[in-house]
Swiss-Prot record:
Lineage, broadest ranks: Bacteria, Pseudomonadati, Campylobacterota, Epsilonproteobacteria, Campylobacterales
Gene: rsmH
Binding site for S-adenosyl-L-methionine: G34, G35, H36, D53, L88, D102, Q109
Cysteine pairs bridged by disulfides in the record: none
Protein name: Ribosomal RNA small subunit methyltransferase H
Example GO BP: rRNA base methylation
Record's function text: Specifically methylates the N4 position of cytidine in position 1402 (C1402) of 16S rRNA.
InterPro entries referenced in this protein's UniProt entry, alphabetically: RsmH (IPR002903), SAM-dep_MeTrfase_MraW_recog (IPR023397), SAM-dependent_MTases_sf (IPR029063)
UniProt entry keywords in alphabetical sequence: Cytoplasm, Methyltransferase, rRNA processing, S-adenosyl-L-methionine, Transferase
Sequence intervals crossing the membrane: none
Catalysed reaction, written as an equation: cytidine(1402) in 16S rRNA + S-adenosyl-L-methionine = N(4)-methylcytidine(1402) in 16S rRNA + S-adenosyl-L-homocysteine + H(+)
Entry EC number(s): 2.1.1.199
Taxonomy, superkingdom: Bacteria
């Protein structure tokens, strides 16, 4: 008997968006341990769900957890930016009613110290796909100072990124996430509720897993293929991701795609892909935050492609 590891973030809000689907296919781009997947399947008995994940341990767990759904669920291993393109070759795009992506590291990955995501881990790894070639050890101990500066500035938005990069290069090698975060504590912003090394670890993790590139690629595919009558829901956990989603949804909603400097519209003014269903991002309710403090940073934005 498997123990269900956790309740998925924003579970009520996600279910509200993906209920009463009469038929068709829903794609869960970030299956994890099957929380959102099972909720959506239970709420919509006539749909099929394609679940994607790159973490083999999550796939092993969810394969067993989702067995009762039989052929209603198909699990695919890999990065969603790649797998969704394969799905569109196998299935009719007109059958796809929903796309869900819960971006970022899962609670289960954070809690497994051997994965190297935690500040207290004795490893430097941070790979969501443990077969991927790039890991945190390479970023920290082999990247040049210039490369580290790019990572810390672009993905951590750290003001003293040059100072931190210089310190890392001068004091490496580092062998664990704990050693790294402890050594850099004096250079990290303090006085906030978050751990001083949060932005540092975020920056390294994003680099290792190409998280922003994956998100951009997913949104590119959705935009290029012009899904019809499909609901797209993205959960993000920090401002970099949320900014990408917000800006892209605004682009999709726009009817006119002429350059801002254009004197008059020459694009037919009929290019809108649909409507934004969330004027502001949906956030977790207080009872969920109390039960799962990590849900505090979760933001859900939803776009509905036109019919």
């Amino acid at each position: 008997m498997q123990t269900i590891p956790h309740v998925p973030v924003l579970y009520r809000e996600v279910l509200e968006q993906f209920k009463n689907i009469k038929n068709g296919i829903v794609i869960d781009c970030t299956m994890g341990y099957g929380g959102h997947t099972s909720l959506i399947l239970d709420a919509n008995p006539n749909i099929k769900l394609i679940a994607i994940d790159q973490d083999q341990s999550a796939i092993d767990f969810s394969t067993k957890r989702l067995e009762p759904y039989g052929d209603r669920v198909v699990i695919k291993k890999g990065r969603f930016s790649t797998i969704i393109k394969e799905i569109l070759k196998e299935y009719d795009i007109s059958d796809i009613r929903g796309i869900l992506a819960d971006i970022g590291v899962s609670s289960l990955q954070l809690d497994k110290k051997e994965r190297g995501f935690s500040f207290f881990s004795e490893n430097l790894d941070m790979r969501m796909d443990e077969d991927a070639p790039l890991n945190a050890n390479i970023v920290i101990n082999e990247y040049s100072s210039h490369e580290l500066q790019r990572v810390l500035l672009e993905y951590g938005e750290l003001r003293n990124y040059k100072q931190i990069a210089s310190f890392i290069v001068s004091n490496r090698p580092f062998y664990s996430a704990k050693e790294l975060s402890d050594a850099l504590r004096h250079l990290m912003p303090s006085g906030k509720k978050i751990h001083p090394a949060t932005l540092l670890m975020q920056a390294i993790r994003i680099e290792v897993n190409n998280e922003l590139g994956e998100l951009e690629s997913l949104l590119d595919t959705i935009q290029e293929r012009k899904f019809l009558d499909t609901k797209v829901a993205i959960i993000s956990f920090h401002s970099l991701e949320d900014r990408i989603v917000k800006n892209r949804f605004n682009e999709w909603r726009a009817s006119c795609i002429c350059p801002q400097e254009a004197m008059r519209c020459t694009c037919t003014n009929d290019n809108s892909l649909g409507n934004i269903l969330t004027k502001k991002p949906i956030i977790a309710q207080m009872d969920e935050i109390q039960a799962n403090p990590r849900s505090r940073s979760a933001k859900l934005r939803v776009f509905e492609m036109k019919k």
